[in-house]
């Protein structure tokens, strides 16, 4: 899985950015908020999601892992494709969308063109209680290990379980005695071991 792309913006289109990396050029479909965030020649880092179907292969780019996580949850809703998911994230910022879900503000989402109350209702039913913004790690003092969390989640593991196992490993006496340079490798191995058990 392609987790992130680092590159230079060489073209801005209506709903995508073209990035030049060391070797390749990538076109990434992005939300309107993401598009507005960058100018030509900017050096950027985008989280990515590769959408694959029989006759379709598209790469989506996101400002951060939270925006990507919401996108992934949205396309898991029956009847919501990647274009509709991106339309939602182009009309409501990802943190505002999370807040709307928590407050059951269906009206806000249903006003988006092409969504409507029925589809918004399906989204709310599917997403309530599933969205994590800035990761639970931030509230536990473990935010510096967020990249480690992302690496393990990108391997296909559930984010909540990964968060839980990182906290467990973090609280081990063995972890406290390690040098800073050794801690991330220890956490990675320990978390994978605990998830597999």
Curated annotation (Swiss-Prot):
Where are the residues of the annotated region Flexible linker?
139
**What is its quaternary makeup?**
Homotetramer. Forms an RuvA(8)-RuvB(12)-Holliday junction (HJ) complex. HJ DNA is sandwiched between 2 RuvA tetramers; dsDNA enters through RuvA and exits via RuvB. An RuvB hexamer assembles on each DNA strand where it exits the tetramer. Each RuvB hexamer is contacted by two RuvA subunits (via domain III) on 2 adjacent RuvB subunits; this complex drives branch migration. In the full resolvosome a probable DNA-RuvA(4)-RuvB(12)-RuvC(2) complex forms which resolves the HJ.
Q: Which gene encodes it?
A: ruvA
Q: Which species?
A: Borreliella burgdorferi (strain ATCC 35210 / DSM 4680 / CIP 102532 / B31) (Borrelia burgdorferi)
Q: Which GO terms describe its molecular function?
A: ATP binding; four-way junction DNA binding; four-way junction helicase activity
State the HAMAP family in the record.
DNA_HJ_migration_RuvA
Protein name, entry field: Holliday junction branch migration complex subunit RuvA
Database matches in InterPro entries: DNA_helicase_Holl-junc_RuvA_I (IPR013849), Hlx-hairpin-Hlx_DNA-bd_motif (IPR003583), NA-bd_OB-fold (IPR012340), RuvA (IPR000085), RuvA_2-like (IPR010994)
**Domain III: where is this region?**
140-197
The UniProt annotation puts the region (Domain II) at: 64-139
């Amino acid at each position: 899985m392609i987790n992130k792309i680092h590159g230079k913006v060489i073209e801005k289109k209506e709903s995508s950015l073209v990035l030049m990396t060391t070797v390749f050029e990538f076109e990434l479909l992005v939300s309107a908020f993401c598009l507005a965030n960058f100018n030509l020649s900017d050096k950027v880092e985008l989280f990515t999601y590769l959408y694959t179907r029989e006759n379709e292969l598209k790469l989506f780019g996101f400002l951060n892992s939270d925006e990507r996580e919401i996108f992934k949850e949205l396309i898991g809703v029956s009847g919501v494709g990647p274009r509709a998911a991106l339309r939602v994230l182009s009309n409501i910022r990802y943190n505002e969308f999370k807040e709307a879900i928590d407050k059951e503000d269906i009206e806000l989402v249903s006003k988006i063109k092409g969504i409507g109350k029925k589809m918004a209702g399906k989204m709310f039913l599917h997403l309530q209680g599933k969205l994590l913004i800035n990761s639970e790690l931030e509230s536990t003092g473990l935010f510096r290990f967020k990249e480690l969390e992302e690496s393990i989640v990108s391997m296909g593991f559930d984010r909540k379980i990964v968060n839980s196992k990182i906290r467990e490993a973090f609280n081990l006496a063995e972890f406290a005695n390690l040098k800073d340079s050794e801690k991330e490798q220890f956490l990675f191995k320990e978390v994978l071991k605990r998830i597999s058990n």
